[in-house]
Amino acid sequence: MAAGVAELDHLMIKVDSLKAATEQFSRMGFDVTPESHIESLGVANRLILLWPRRPGVANFLELMSVPDSENVDPTMAHVLSASEGIKMIVHLAVDIEKFVATIRERETWVDPIWDIRRQWQTPDGESQTIRFRVTKPVPGGAPFTINAYQPNVIGQYLQDRFRHHANGARHVAAVTGVASAQQFAPAVAYFEDLYGIAAQRAGEGIAEIKPRDVTLRIVTATSFAGLYPEIGPVPLQLPCLAAVTIEVSDLHGVARLLAANDVSHVRRGQPAGIVVGPHEACGVTFEFVPA
């Protein structure tokens, strides 16, 4: 891939309370990892781990909050400002220096990389030092907030004990970003250039870019309303990342689970899927589709 990234690895979702978010996502049938703190950035997270389609990459949702607003890194405070919802696409880099160099061809980027170290205990009790080289959010003209990271090990994101979800979730298949009609073409062009591939048009005001196994779908606000009429009018601050598509092993099972847990949802026949609106999922529209 042109920018030195291997995959759209995970989505960072801002939540006001990790405890409340865990309760919400558990009602939707997701297993959630224990709370973890990244002290150097002043943030806390819990993960929803899923199954990547190839070795060497991860596939998950990161629920992130700010435990103490007085001690959060200013950059992260900005990313996690405003309301709940998807705040950033995080790419897995095969060469983080190449990713930075690609961005620097078009933007000035001073001191772009955080070097983070933390301890992690494997399921068999072994202690490992995890080193993350993480870029700050890409500056300038990126239509949606993006960054990249390069961990020295990836096993912490592939723990089977947290990947057997009651809703049968298998894979983050797509993320949908919404732009105004005027922003749409430049947004598509930005990611075509970043990934070095052409977008596929999937309808009026809908473009899909699939650098590997996860699709970035860019749509206009009008097209977003057409894709998800079930959730009704949604106030969106454009541009924004608004929806995630999750592949599941049993759509009927998801419907039964959501009904049993009193999670408001709409089942549709064509294309087959179940939609949960942002009021039920920390500001994110969830679309469950057959794997």
Stretches found by the model and what they are:
Residues 38-42:
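Acidic-and-aromatic substrate-binding clefts and catalytic sites of carbohydrate-active enzymes
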